[in-house]
A protein has these predicted regions:
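Mixed-charge interfacial surface used for oligomerization/domain docking
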Residues: 164-269
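Gly-rich Lys/Arg/Thr-decorated short loops/hinges at beta-loop-alpha junctions or inter-strand turns
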Residues: 44-52, 61-74, 136-138, 209-225
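Short alpha-helices
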Residues: 128-170, 174-181
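C-terminal non-catalytic interaction/assembly regions of soluble proteins
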Residues: 239, 244-330
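Short, acidic/small-residue loops that bind anionic groups at enzyme active sites
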Residues: 73-78, 121-144, 280-285, 289
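Glycine-rich oxoanion-binding loops at beta->alpha junctions
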Residues: 57, 64-96, 241
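Short Gly/Thr/Asp-enriched flexible loops that form oxyanion-binding sites at enzyme active sites
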Residues: 111-124, 130, 266-272
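N-terminal amphipathic/basic leader segments beginning at the initiator methionine
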Residues: 1-49, 311-330
């Protein structure tokens, strides 16, 4: 195992310390329990957005804390769910009286712990569950579909509504709508190594890929031989289109996400290949995002997310955002 680390026990804490020091104008990092908030207090009357999950998926979620997105994020240990006390401490810190919206990826530990935190909270709260992965219905981590890269889009779009004064119920409704109008699927060319484990999560041959892989290395639909990029892209996107059923001339947001170990050169190539398929079906790409946002440590691979847009979703996607990982309009 080759990683920049001192000890596995200190890996997360040192990473959080570095993140906080590098972005102290945007975030504040708290310890025991670990959570991240904006550096400035939540505005009175603003719905507070909180998300979280296992570390190793950076910049999701800590890198998405800031103006126009999250108010707080709860990082668990690598690929392990955060605990209810983290979520409760974060909620108590950022709740300004308008309520708290938890954005939760559909993994059993995340769902259970966020539900426990919600039950312990004194004030009003709601949850949005993301389950955009069309690859499999059930996995070792979930009952039902997994929550993956569309979570980033939910956090951006709902974050905009919350910033503009949307109510708790309005924010939940928009989050549910974005999730329902999004589909994702990924492929891995390599595994990844959790620091505490010291060995790859799974094994892949030099000429193999895991098609439909999860963000923790969960098995996908099948293991196959590497193919040309256009063939891989077409299969990922066709599975999403079959699930979403966009109409001809529908406007969409196309998000090509890196898993952590794939260079941007290749991600833009995938975007080009995806555009060719969507153009052939008269599905319009009116918004786009390319980069490493929902990663799996050093895994080589990529995922594609397609989101059907309406005027409300597009407006909140375009609005100002300033986080460590995403910034425009400021």
């Amino acid at each position: 195992m080759k990683k920049f680390m001192n000890t596995a026990d200190d890996f997360l804490k040192e990473s959080l310390q570095g993140f906080g020091a590098a972005h102290q104008d945007i975030v504040s990092v708290y310890y025991d329990p670990n959570f991240i908030t904006r550096s400035q207090p939540t505005k009175d009357g603003k719905v507070a957005l909180i998300s979280g999950g296992g570390s190793g998926h950076e910049p999701m979620h800590g890198g998405l804390v800031g103006h126009g997105m999250l108010d707080a994020a709860c990082p668990g240990f690598v690929f392990s769910s955060p605990t209810p006390d983290q979520m409760l401490a974060a909620a108590e810190k950022v709740d300004s009286g308008a309520g708290v919206l938890f954005i939760v990826k559909n993994y059993s530990g995340d769902v259970m712990n966020f539900q426990m935190a919600a039950e312990m909270m004194q004030g009003p709260n709601e949850s949005v569950l993301t389950n955009d992965d069309v690859a499999v219905e059930d996995s070792s981590f979930t009952t039902g579909r997994r929550g993956v890269a569309a979570t980033v889009l939910v956090e951006k779009i709902v974050g905009s509504l919350a910033e503009s004064g949307g109510s708790l119920q309005e924010c939940k409704a928009l989050g549910d709508k974005v999730n329902q109008n999004s589909g994702s699927m990924g492929v891995a060319f390599s595994s990844c190594t959790v620091p505490a484990a010291g060995k790859p999560t799974f094994e892949l041959g030099a000429d193999e890929m895991e098609f439909g892989v999860g963000i923790h290395g969960e098995p996908g639909r099948r293991r196959d031989k590497i193919k040309p990029a256009q063939d891989i892209t077409n299969e990922l996107l066709e599975a999403i289109i079959e699930d979403l059923k966009p109409n001809s001339n529908d406007e969409t947001l196309l998000f090509v996400n890196g898993m952590g170990g794939t260079p941007l050169t290749e991600l833009y190539l995938v975007f080009d290949n995806a555009k060719k398929l969507l153009d052939s079906k008269n599905i319009k790409i009116s918004r786009s995002l390319v980069g490493n946002f929902c990663t799996s440590l050093e895994m080589q691979g990529a995922s594609i997310t397609l989101t059907k847009l309406d005027e409300e979703i597009a407006k909140h996607w375009d609005s100002k955002v300033h986080t460590a990982a995403m910034r425009w309009g400021m």
